[in-house]
């Protein structure tokens, strides 16, 4: 049996879709309380990590208007969140993945407008 063919080249449309998801998420943080739990927060900020991983594959020209959209979404996220004492995935995961507050800042922030369930779960993050 032949092995499957290697994946094709990355598609900038996939990156644009991730940026659209990130922009929608960040715009919501500014207008309403974050009403979900820690698992959802992790999923939401993981989108930004996927964007970081894809960015080196495309120029700002290839990204088109989405380059500016990403910049604006990042600013919106920063304005609607606060520094968190640890990586929201925990120190062990941050160490293993080599995530830092400088490079992977989305993993070291939590919503300003939160909820009690999320805050209780964040209190257990080590």
What are these model-derived regions, one by one?
Residues 3-54, 62, 66-119, 126:
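Long, compositionally biased low-complexity segments enriched in polar/charged residues
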């Amino acid at each position: 049996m032949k092995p499957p063919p290697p994946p094709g080249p990355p598609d900038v449309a996939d990156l644009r879709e991730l940026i659209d998801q990130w922009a929608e998420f960040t715009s919501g943080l500014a207008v309403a309380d974050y009403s979900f739990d820690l698992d959802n927060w992790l999923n939401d900020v993981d989108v930004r990590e996927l964007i970081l991983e894809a960015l080196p594959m495309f120029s700002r020209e290839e990204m088109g208007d989405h380059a500016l959209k990403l910049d604006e979404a990042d600013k919106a996220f920063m304005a609607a969140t606060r520094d968190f004492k640890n990586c929201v995935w925990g120190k062990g995961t941050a160490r293993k993945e080599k995530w830092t507050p400088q490079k992977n800042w989305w993993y070291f922030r939590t919503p300003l407008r939160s909820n009690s369930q999320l805050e209780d779960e964040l209190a257990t993050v080590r």
